[in-house]
């Protein structure tokens, strides 16, 4: 039987073109670094910062929540304010020479994360509020779950329920807060740079920024809402954006943040404490070739600036009267009273004396 010739197939369509990403997170992206050592994994956990220190028997809880009697007399204590947990992870250094046109940067591409300790919420025999001979009340109430991964500190927006609230010393809050902080005031922003000092009720991730970070959050309200939590080690959250680029770790540093309020623990006297749980992270990073974002002049200036200790002293910008620097020798000037000096730009200037009658 003679073989049939293949019919000429229709020409294939050209693949659809997509925008070529040039800059992400303030860094010009070039390509990926392949090889057996181009992927690394990092495991970390963040403990909750509910208010009480790790030396207190109620570590992981807040102090009993008190309620203001008037709107303009709202003064919560620091140990009653759950705050964000923050950490900075130092990654292996990738570049020995930072003067090249291109360098390597770590790019975080995925994360596995879960709240650790939801099993503790089934405890109904420890001391707490109870009705007659019934078990003590389990943890109930509002739930707030948040985590973030970034190549630099997470950008936050300040927004509050009561602008007249007088927040205590030791937390990051606006003093005094303008009325505009009860809605979105684009002037009130900050970076999440401290552990246990940014109150959750005051700071939210800034949706207009955070191009070099990824954040996720859920909230369920109510005083008696039963917490609903899931855990698994089979779910991976991809951190790549629509252009296939994840957070780029500037300075070989990875920033993570978390906040996990699981409800209230109700005391026998009807006092309420916030209950928080820790969060586990497993992060996967790969090497990305990028255009060098660090000018050599900036690197050298930073090097010499950091070599000297940081001294907080009196302002000397208008106090230095005269600085003399000698170099080599010269012929004796004919006018010893003539003032010669170099200005702040290194240029030589001569002040010709003016004779007044």
From Swiss-Prot:
Keyword annotations from UniProtKB, A to Z: Capsid protein, Disulfide bond, Host nucleus, Host-virus interaction, Late protein, Phosphoprotein, T=7 icosahedral capsid protein, Viral attachment to host cell, Viral penetration into host cytoplasm, Virion, Virus endocytosis by host, Virus entry into host cell
Region: C-terminal arm, residue numbers: 296-357
Cellular-component GO terms for this entry: host cell nucleus; T=7 icosahedral viral capsid
Similarity annotation: Belongs to the polyomaviruses coat protein VP1 family.
UniProt organism field: Squirrel monkey polyomavirus
Record note on domains: A DNA-binding domain overlapping a bipartite nuclear localization signal is present in the N-terminal region of the protein and is required for efficient virus formation. The intrinsically disordered C-terminal arm interacts with neighboring pentamers. The unstructured nature of this region allows to make different interactions depending on the structural context: pentamers present at the 12 icosahedral fivefold axes bind five pentamers, whereas pentamers present at the 60 icosahedral six-fold axes interact with six pentamers.
Record text on subunit structure and interactions: Homomultimer; disulfide-linked. The virus capsid is composed of 72 icosahedral units, each one composed of five disulfide-linked copies of VP1. Interacts with minor capsid proteins VP2 and VP3.
Full protein name: Major capsid protein VP1
Molecular function GO labels: structural molecule activity
Subcellular location: Virion; Host nucleus
Gene: VP1
Record function comment: Forms an icosahedral capsid with a T=7 symmetry and a 40 nm diameter. The capsid is composed of 72 pentamers linked to each other by disulfide bonds and associated with VP2 or VP3 proteins. Interacts with sialic acids on the cell surface to provide virion attachment to target cell. Once attached, the virion is internalized by endocytosis and traffics to the endoplasmic reticulum. Inside the endoplasmic reticulum, the protein folding machinery isomerizes VP1 interpentamer disulfide bonds, thereby triggering initial uncoating.
Phosphothreonine sites (modified residues): 329
GO biological process: endocytosis involved in viral entry into host cell; virion attachment to host cell
Motif (Bipartite nuclear localization signal): 4-13
InterPro entries: Capsid_VP1_Polyomavir (IPR000662), dsDNA_vir_gr_I_capsid (IPR011222), Polyomavir_VP1_sf (IPR036931)
One Pfam match: Polyoma_coat
